[in-house]
Amino acid sequence: MAKAKFERNKPHVNVGTIGHVDHGKTTLTAAIATVAAKTFGGEAKDYAAIDSAPEEKARGITINTSHIEYDTADRHYAHVDCPGHADYVKNMITGAAQMDGAILVVSATDGPMPQTREHILLSRQVGVPYIMVFMNKCDMVDDEELLELVEMEVRELLSDYDFPGDDTPIIKGSALEALNGKDGKYGEPAVIELLQTLDTYIPEPERDIDKPFLMPIEDVFSISGRGTVVTGRVESGIVKVGDEIEIVGIRDTQKTTCTGVEMFRKLLDEGRAGENCGVLLRGTKREDVQRGQVLAKPGSITPHTKFDAEVYVLSKEEGGRHTPFLNGYRPQFYFRTTDVTGAISLQEGTEMVMPGDNVEMSVELIHPIAMDKGLRFAIREGGRTVGAGVVANVKD
C-alpha cells in the first residue's frame, strides 16, 4: 500500500492533556484519537500504544511522553500525553513539547486534586496560553448539583492562576464511554464537542517566521575587506540585506546594519527562521560582538539580569547533584549559546532544594542576557547539567 503523503495544507497546532494522576488523561487521549479518526479520517492509536510512552531526551533529561496526531475538519493537531507527574513537570519546564493550548482533565468523581492545581500553576509559569477543561467520568455521578459544584471549583482554581476561569470552556463527558464508541451525551458527542472547542478556543499560533527577527550568535569572524560576520541559526523572523538590527545582551545594546547574508558560502537577500546563516554587520568590530549575544529587530527584545524562573532540578539518577542546594547558590545559567553565572534566591519559607524537585526561584545574573518570558535555560555546574528552567517573569 502506498504511504500516505503528509499534507501540510491545514494549520498545525500543538496541544496536550494535563491533570491529576488517574483522572483519565491517557484514556481521553485515546478517545480523541479514536473519535477524530472515525469522524474526520486518519489513523487511531489505541490506549496501550499511548500508555507505553517512549523515553526521549530533552536537554539531557529523560522524559517519557506519548505523541499522537489527529485531524479535525480545519486543523492538524499534535498531542502530547505524559504517564507520570514528574514527566509533566520536566516536559513543561524544558519545553520538550511546547503547547499552544492544554486540555485539563478533571474527574467529576474527585474534583480538583493537588496535581490539578500544580499543572495549572506550571501552565501559568511556562506560558501555556490557553486551557480548556474536560470533566471526565460524568457517567459515574448521578447528582447534577455535584457536577455543577465541581465545575465551579475548577473555574475558581483557573481564576486563582490568572486564567479566565469564568469564560473557560468546560466539556462534560466520559472518556471511557467515548473510547468504547457509546453515543450517549457523555460518549462520542462529548469528544466531538471537545474537538470543535479546540478548533474555536485555541487561536492559530503565530509561526516563527512571522515573529520579529532573532538570531543567537554562535560565532564571530572578521573577513578582510568586508567586515565582521556573525553566524547562528535564525530563531524567528527574517533578516534582509539593508535591515537595521540590534546586538543585544552581555554588553550595552549596539545598533548596526545587515550588509549581507550568506548560507553555505552563497550570498542571499535574506535569512529566514530555521536557517543557519552568516550575517555581515556594517561598521561593527570583531571585538565588539561575542557568542551569547543575539541579533534582533530593534526594540523587540531587551537585556535583563534579574528574573523569576520555574526550575526542575535533576535527580542524581539523571546525572544531577547528589546533595540539595541552598539560597545563594551560584551555578552557571546556559542561555541559547552561552553560560552566565548567576545567584539564586529561593522563595520565603524554602530553605533548600532537593534533587528531583521543581521550584520557583529568583535569579540575578552577572551579565545581562536578551530574554523574554518563556525563554528556556539549563543550569550547569562544571560543564554538566544539574537543572532545567524557564523564565516566568523578567524584572530588570
UniProtKB/Swiss-Prot annotation:
It is an enzyme of class 3 (hydrolase). Residues 81-84 are annotated as: G3. It is found in: Cytoplasm. InterPro entries: EF-Tu_GTP-bd (IPR041709), EF-Tu_GTPase (IPR050055), EFTu-like_2 (IPR004161), EFTU_2 (IPR033720), G_TR_CS (IPR031157), P-loop_NTPase (IPR027417), Small_GTP-bd (IPR005225), T_Tr_GTP-bd_dom (IPR000795). Residues 10-206 form the tr-type G domain. Pfam families: GTP_EFTU, GTP_EFTU_D2, GTP_EFTU_D3. Its main location: cytoplasm. GO terms for cellular component: cytosol. It comes from the Bacteria. Residues 136-139 are annotated as: G4. Monomer. Belongs to the TRAFAC class translation factor GTPase superfamily. Classic translation factor GTPase family. EF-Tu/EF-1A subfamily. This is Elongation factor Tu 1. It comes from Psychrobacter sp. (strain PRwf-1). The gene is tuf1.
